[in-house]
Amino acid sequence: MPSLDKRLSLTRREVEERRRARPLAQLEREVAALAPIRPFTESIGGEEISFVQRVKEADGALLELAEELEVAAVAAALGPLAEMAADNALPMLLTDMVVDPYQLYECRLAGAGAVLLVAAAFEDDHERLAELYSVAGSVDLDVIVEVAHEDELEEALELLDPDSFLLRNRGSDDDGSVDFERTFSLLEEVPAGKTVFSQGGVREREQVAALERSGVDAVILGPWAAAGDLAETLRQLRGESR
């Protein structure tokens, strides 16, 4: 996977290309004409942990199945989100790296109800992070702030005090390894009343149960779950009998 700096640089270039083809003022007018959208996080929670399914491409049959299986929401990049918007009844989360307000207008026009803001991407630019958070709220987008360390959590709480956080279950070296203990440790510092999402390495019922006991509200499942037998995967993760 490319480094964070390379991802940020590539994203900025791509956004500039799209902005030249379709000016921000045009997007602002189109967003202003949209009807209000149901808050994304209203789909999360309840008595049991929720599941959000990441998808790589628009797939009507998969979306119908996900809805039947009571998946809380779907998550995808901008392209698939825009393609599936017309035929999808589930709330949608943008998974793209967001670095520019322009993307928030694109996201809202694609039908999504929430975006991820990665705290590490704004380590040296808290002003831009605050700007993105504010603009997202102005266009009816919920914001989920991804934090990987306690200092990022503290800074996000001080700067934004967001309603939702994403905690990735990854090792301290960010080498692709999975470590749930980092998530459990961070959860102890998340104030009560926040909505917490977990992502990475969740494939067993015992892992889901441990996350739920620790205060996680929703698990974001990777595309692997949708590529196989989604019904069976969810049955196992929920601990349901056949």
Predicted features along the sequence, with ranges:
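An N-cap/entry alpha-helix motif that binds or orients negatively charged groups
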Residues: 1-60
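N-terminal active-site wall of soluble small-molecule enzyme domains
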Residues: 53, 57-141, 150-155, 164-166, ...
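Catalytic cores of alpha/beta
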Residues: 92, 99-111, 149-161, 192-221
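Short gly/pro/ser/thr-enriched loop/turn and capping motifs at secondary-structure boundaries
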Residues: 100, 123, 172-174, 226-228
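C-terminal helical cap(s) of enzyme catalytic domains, especially alpha/beta-barrels
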Residues: 180-189, 212, 221-242
